Amino acid sequence: MYGGVIYPRILDELIPNWFEHAPIQRWVVRRSTMLLSDTGALNIDYRSNAWGQAPYNGATAYRPDFDNWLAQQAVAAGAELICSTTVTGLLRDAQGRINGITTDRPDGDLTASVVIACDGVNSFIAKDAGLYASVDASNYTLGVKETLSLPKSVIDERFGVRDNQGVDIEILGGTSGVNGGGFIYTNLDTIALGVVLKLPKLSAQKKRPEEIIAELKRHP
């Protein structure tokens, strides 16, 4: 999953017929790659109405809704969900092997045979484990997204879709001289518009990401 687009191959393996229950906004039936210059665009577009039928090719979703649903699927399969808890460090056995985590809860230590660090690109757990020897900003990008409200009928008309059909557009260029690109996803009554920017050039340009999004929206 990337941002608000779900690619279902792994879900197909883990949760049969997940698409019958998941909180989906739209099923992606059109995917485009758009190359932008300062004043023009070249669009490579592919559309298949078959993608709007099971087992589907991709979907858009609101992450809070989808992530909550996915967590409940894990609970139903036997996982224990612990919310409102901050992981503060790692536990190690006498040989120095990682065998659990510490938390901000009283008596909140948890032991495990496997610990998976899911605390983001700046993972403090991975650093504590010694997996981040150094951090090079040139290996990182920054993603920023706006969500724009529009009536469903307007989205359907502008993107040439109907019912719960959706569109996924990936953009190369159009980021004000900063290495990177952008994206547009359609939800039922909103559009997600965002950019992904290389950190060194973004810092050198001394521009804020929201300024680059504003310039992208003004592209002719």
State where each predicted segment sits.
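N-terminal FAD cofactor-binding segment of flavoenzymes
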Residues: 1-39
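Short, glycine/acidic-enriched capping/hinge loops at junctions between secondary-structure elements
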Residues: 1-2, 44-46, 127-128, 205-206
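Generic secondary-structure boundary/loop-capping signal
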Residues: 2-3, 8, 30-31, 41, ...
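Residues that recognize and position ribonucleotide moieties
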Residues: 4, 26, 59, 80, ...
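Short, mixed charged/polar active-site loops
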Residues: 39-43, 107-109
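Helix-loop-beta segment of a Rossmann-like dinucleotide-binding subdomain
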Residues: 41-63, 196-199
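Predominantly flavin-linked oxidoreductase catalytic cores and closely associated redox partners
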Residues: 64, 69, 73-220
